């Protein structure tokens, strides 16, 4: 089969690889669409330490089942499916407690690190265990279904955030996940959703997708603007979707007394904690990692049109065009958001 392999950092090659072997509890999926994730871009240059070459990356995917393992139940050849990116063991204490995203033996598709190596979906075929696979309706395109993994991260982050129906929330970072969080937070009942970013183009999309207010932190004092919007009180909740020092600090500065800060971005390994602010204002901090069983909910929300992903898709690409898109995305091409790879397109 054809696959796009990271041969060394910043070097992707189209290669021929053996067909994946379908284990007894696995499904062999012909990949119809796979999104290029921001984490793939960070892995491309080795900065994340989680894409050690040689590796086939890609974890946001959808496709058609072409083979089922002998122990698989509930799936058959021809099923249209998507799948989670996190492979959980189902046996550890966290899995048994229902927190599969915290699995002690967790692996991630398209990731290689010191603990494991798992080939991903920038290939014509991929094998995935049946416990992370979900059927999708005929009405949902493969391109949109490839966005479900990203949507599940936004849904999980929203589920981790205390609800304030009619309340206010600020999303710091209007990238892909941030723009999805804006939609899920509106669905959760927040009346004021404030998008904060450094680029007007992203803030324009944020408005189209439901943000009631936008703030360009490059040209405006974000804290002052948010305080003006909330009559000096601060937002009920803030959500950081970048993973860097400055936006994390902004989240703590704009939240009201007794409010909450949800941390989704994890680009920077560590940031300073404003300890006295957290203690004296009695703030609650929530980490949000991947998703925890929200994919069926995401499928329903996309199929019904409650969440829009079409405005976030910049382009589709064949497998032999994908390396060029990695270069463009790595260079920070303005206006580029999600690129969907179609490994079996001719």
Task: Outline where the language-model segments fall.
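C-terminal hydrophobic helical "lid"/dimerization subdomain
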Residues: 3, 249-253, 292, 296-346
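Glycine-rich beta-strand-centered segment in the early N-terminal region that forms part
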Residues: 20-34, 47-96, 137-139
């Amino acid at each position: 089969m054809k696959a796009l392999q990271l041969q060394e950092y910043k070097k992707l090659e189209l290669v021929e690889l053996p067909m994946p072997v379908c284990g007894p509890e696995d499904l062999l999926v012909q990949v119809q669409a796979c999104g290029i994730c921001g984490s793939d871009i960070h892995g491309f240059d080795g900065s994340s330490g989680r894409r050690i070459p040689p590796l086939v990356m890609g974890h946001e995917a959808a496709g058609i089942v072409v083979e089922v393992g002998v122990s698989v139940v509930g799936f058959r050849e021809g099923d249209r499916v998507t799948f989670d990116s996190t492979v959980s063991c189902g046996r550890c204490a966290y899995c048994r407690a229902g927190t599969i995203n915290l699995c002690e033996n967790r692996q991630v598709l398209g990731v290689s690190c010191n603990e494991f190596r798992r080939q991903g979906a920038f290939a014509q075929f991929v094998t995935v265990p049946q416990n992370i696979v979900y059927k999708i309706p005929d009405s949902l395109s493969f391109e949109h279904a490839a966005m479900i993994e990203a949507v599940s991260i936004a849904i999980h982050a929203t589920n981790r955030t205390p609800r304030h129906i009619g309340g206010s929330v600020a999303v710091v970072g209007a990238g892909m996940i941030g723009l999805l969080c804006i939609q899920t937070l509106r669905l959760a009942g927040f009346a004021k959703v404030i998008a904060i970013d450094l680029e007007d183009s992203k803030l324009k999309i944020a408005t189209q997708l439901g943000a009631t207010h936008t703030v360009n932190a490059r040209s405006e004092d974000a804290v002052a603007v948010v305080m003006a919007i909330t009559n000096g009180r601060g937002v009920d909740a803030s959500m950081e979707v970048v993973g860097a020092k400055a936006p994390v600090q902004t989240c703590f500065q704009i939240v009201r007394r007794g409010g909450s800060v949800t941390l989704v971005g994890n680009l920077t390994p560590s940031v300073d904690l404003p300890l006295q602010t957290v203690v004296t204002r009695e703030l609650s901090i929530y980490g949000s990692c991947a998703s925890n069983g929200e994919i069926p909910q995401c499928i329903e929300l996309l199929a019904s049109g409650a969440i829009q992903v079409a405005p976030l898709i910049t382009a589709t690409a064949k497998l032999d065009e994908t390396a060029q898109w990695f270069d463009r995305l790595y260079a920070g091409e303005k206006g580029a958001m999600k690129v969907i790879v179609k490994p079996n397109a001719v």
